[in-house]
UniProtKB/Swiss-Prot annotation:
<dbReference type="InterPro" id="IPR022417">
    <property type="entry name" value="Porphobilin_deaminase_N"/>
</dbReference>
<dbReference type="InterPro" id="IPR036803">
    <property type="entry name" value="Porphobilinogen_deaminase_C_sf"/>
</dbReference>
<dbReference type="GO" id="GO:0006782">
    <property type="term" value="P:protoporphyrinogen IX biosynthetic process"/>
</dbReference>
<dbReference type="InterPro" id="IPR022418">
    <property type="entry name" value="Porphobilinogen_deaminase_C"/>
</dbReference>
<dbReference type="GO" id="GO:0004418">
    <property type="term" value="F:hydroxymethylbilane synthase activity"/>
</dbReference>
<keyword id="KW-0627">Porphyrin biosynthesis</keyword>
<dbReference type="InterPro" id="IPR022419">
    <property type="entry name" value="Porphobilin_deaminase_cofac_BS"/>
</dbReference>
<feature type="modified residue" description="S-(dipyrrolylmethanemethyl)cysteine">
    <location>
        <position position="242"/>
    </location>
</feature>
<dbReference type="Pfam" id="PF01379">
    <property type="entry name" value="Porphobil_deam"/>
</dbReference>
<protein>
    <recommendedName>
        <fullName>Porphobilinogen deaminase</fullName>
        <ecNumber>2.5.1.61</ecNumber>
    </recommendedName>
</protein>
<comment type="subunit">
    <text>Monomer.</text>
</comment>
<comment type="pathway">
    <text>Porphyrin-containing compound metabolism; protoporphyrin-IX biosynthesis; coproporphyrinogen-III from 5-aminolevulinate: step 2/4.</text>
</comment>
<keyword id="KW-0808">Transferase</keyword>
<dbReference type="Pfam" id="PF03900">
    <property type="entry name" value="Porphobil_deamC"/>
</dbReference>
<comment type="function">
    <text>Tetrapolymerization of the monopyrrole PBG into the hydroxymethylbilane pre-uroporphyrinogen in several discrete steps.</text>
</comment>
<comment type="similarity">
    <text>Belongs to the HMBS family.</text>
</comment>
<dbReference type="InterPro" id="IPR000860">
    <property type="entry name" value="HemC"/>
</dbReference>
């Protein structure tokens, strides 16, 4: 492979393409003379659209095909939403860079209502996320939760056609696609704890590729890395994939990192919440300690039941 070419494996969805184009533009800005090529492809999670993600099972529904492309040397890097990225990597691949985070909150999207609290009894809310479902049901058990799959445009079209009274999406995706006007309300982390890594973009590459690692290094955002590492460490210890009722959100104030986490029954009947604080350089240890706290208070029972269903 030429020293001045780098090939990005990416999913074909508009949001995934935005992320890949963002990385391409940053690399070309930082390294004049570098040519960046995109290799768009479909993943299992993109193809199977008629089944709830939690029912398809397995981890890495949106990444495996991209990883195969790197292992076969058809691509040099893969760009991912951190919340879709499994905590374990195939041998020879690893997470190299975490870029600066966009807004990590969930967004309430509706054509007729301003917030979850405004929704009438029995209103239909669309989301395929067990994490969002458990928190919505805990706050509003009178609402009807209906599964919602597809890319951002598909989901908005289903809302507009009247299938749902409201839908919940990641705010970052709407902002990146310049669809901010569709956001009726940003849902605070207190109301809906985000998924681990939500709003952050990660770059994976071959662990032995020194050339690519050097090219990627300037894209690293250290504060985002600490936050996401803490969130992912909690998720790893809980053995969570991207389709589990687990929320994790880290914030940094000076050198101090505060991590909030939760595990909940998808029906909202039980939610276990915890918080831990410490030095940001201990991000992984903080995440693991919060996971242990949640497990000691019954999180394992909840997660075992989810995995068995």
């Amino acid at each position: 492979m030429s020293e001045n070419i780098i090939r990005i494996a990416t999913r074909k969805s508009p949001l995934a393409m935005w992320q890949a184009e963002f990385v391409k533009a940053e690399l070309e800005r930082i390294h004049p003379g570098l040519t960046v090529e995109l290799l768009p492809m479909s993943t299992k999670g993109d193809v199977i659209l008629d089944t709830p993600l939690a029912k398809i099972g397995g981890k890495g529904l949106f990444v495996k095909e991209l990883e195969v492309a790197m292992l076969e040397n058809r691509a040099d890097i893969a760009v991912h939403s951190m919340k879709d990225l499994p905590v374990e990597f195939p041998e020879g691949l690893g997470l190299q860079v975490i870029c600066e985070r966009e807004d990590p909150r969930d967004a309430f999207v509706s054509n007729n209502y301003k917030s979850i609290s405004e929704l009438p009894q029995g209103a239909v809310v669309g989301t395929s996320s067990l994490r969002r479902q458990c928190q919505i049901r805990a706050a509003r058990p009178d609402l009807v939760i209906k599964d919602l799959r597809g890319n951002v445009g598909t989901r908005l079209a289903k809302l507009d056609s009247g299938d749902y009274d409201a839908i919940i999406l990641a705010a970052a995706g709407l902002i990146r696609l310049k669809l901010n006007e569709r956001i009726a309300n940003f849902i605070s982390a207190e109301e809906s704890l985000p998924a681990n890594g939500q709003g952050a973009v990660g770059i994976e590459c071959r662990t032995d590729d020194a050339r690519v690692k050097a090219l990627l290094a300037p894209l690293e955002h250290l504060e985002t890395r600490y936050r996401v590492l803490a969130e992912r460490a909690m998720n790893t210890r809980l053995e969570g994939g991207c389709q589990v009722p687990i929320g994790a959100f880290a914030e940094i104030n000076g050198d101090n990192l505060t991590l909030r986490g939760l595990v909940g029954n998808p029906d909202g009947s039980q939610i276990i919440i915890g918080t831990v604080s410490g030095s940001k350089t201990d991000a992984v240890a903080l995440g693991e300690s919060l996971a242990e706290d949640l497990l000691s208070r019954g999180a394992k029972t909840i997660l075992d039941a989810v995995y068995a269903s």
